[in-house]
């Protein structure tokens, strides 16, 4: 019986090459996920969004897909056998982080459905879904994926040198965008977010910097905790808004009440 044998070095090289291409896609994805919906906001008016389900879907697809894929990748990496801890406290932290990553993935997918079904009846809705929300959660997702380590026993913020300053800029612009009342100012800060990302990508390509060998230092753990707290609030808001939209669209609460009513009457 003839069998085809693939040399182990070839498989390893192919796997490494695939990982390299996948890494390049994920590096560019946050830029595209911010720029594309912002461009859609500029090109189309609120009536166009309100009247087209497809247009709303295309606008929210990239940013929320990036979020879903990135958290799924983080979850997959965290669940690798060599990353599983042995101690009780470490295990509790490990499974809590995995549960959060899974929740963020599901919320991202749910948001694509819910925000597409929403009517976008005014300019505030268009601004929220195309600029404000992406410019808030994408920087957090990006930093969590490239600047932090989530493996128990090594948890912390890992960037060093000039990358720390770039990370501060990445966090600063979106936060300022949320407190700006004028839509043009929100758009400006959302666009400015692209600059530190581009600077970081170019720097890592031509002058890569190392990661901290002690990510568990107190201030590094505190930075990671801050990012996780911001992520938690961002995705809690997205989940609550998605549930309200789905309830308004499908009447989920009314259906649950009708289902539970007979059981209460039987008692």
UniProtKB/Swiss-Prot annotation:
Pfam families xref list: DUF2463
InterPro entries: UPF0328
Superkingdom assignment: Eukaryota
Family per record: Belongs to the UPF0328 family.
Name the record gives this protein: UPF0328 protein ECU06_0070
Lineage: Eukaryota, Fungi, Fungi incertae sedis, Microsporidia, Unikaryonidae
């Amino acid at each position: 019986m003839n069998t085809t044998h693939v040399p182990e070095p070839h498989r390893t090289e192919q796997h490494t090459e695939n990982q390299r291409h996948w890494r390049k896609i994920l590096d560019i994805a946050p830029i595209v996920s911010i720029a594309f919906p912002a461009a859609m906001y500029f090109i189309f008016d609120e009536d166009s969004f309100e009247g087209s389900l497809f247009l709303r879907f295309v606008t929210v697809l990239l940013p929320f897909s990036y979020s879903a894929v990135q958290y799924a990748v983080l979850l997959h990496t965290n669940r690798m056998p060599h990353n599983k801890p042995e101690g009780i406290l470490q295990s509790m932290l490990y499974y809590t982080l995995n549960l959060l990553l899974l929740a963020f993935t599901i919320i991202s997918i749910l948001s694509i459905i819910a925000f597409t079904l929403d009517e976008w009846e005014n300019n505030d809705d268009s601004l929220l879904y195309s600029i404000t929300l992406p410019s808030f959660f994408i920087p957090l997702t990006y930093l969590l994926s490239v600047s932090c380590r989530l493996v128990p026993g090594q948890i912390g913020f890992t960037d060093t040198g000039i990358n720390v300053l770039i990370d501060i800029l990445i966090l600063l612009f979106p936060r300022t965008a949320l407190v700006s009342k004028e839509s043009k100012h929100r758009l400006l800060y959302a666009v400015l977010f692209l600059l530190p990302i581009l600077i970081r990508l170019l720097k890592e390509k031509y002058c890569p910097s190392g990661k901290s060998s002690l990510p568990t230092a107190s201030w590094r753990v505190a930075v990671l905790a801050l990012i996780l707290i911001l992520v938690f609030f961002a995705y809690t808001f997205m989940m609550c808004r998605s549930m309200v939209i789905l309830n308004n669209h499908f009447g989920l609460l009314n259906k649950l009440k009708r289902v539970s009513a007979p059981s209460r009457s039987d008692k």
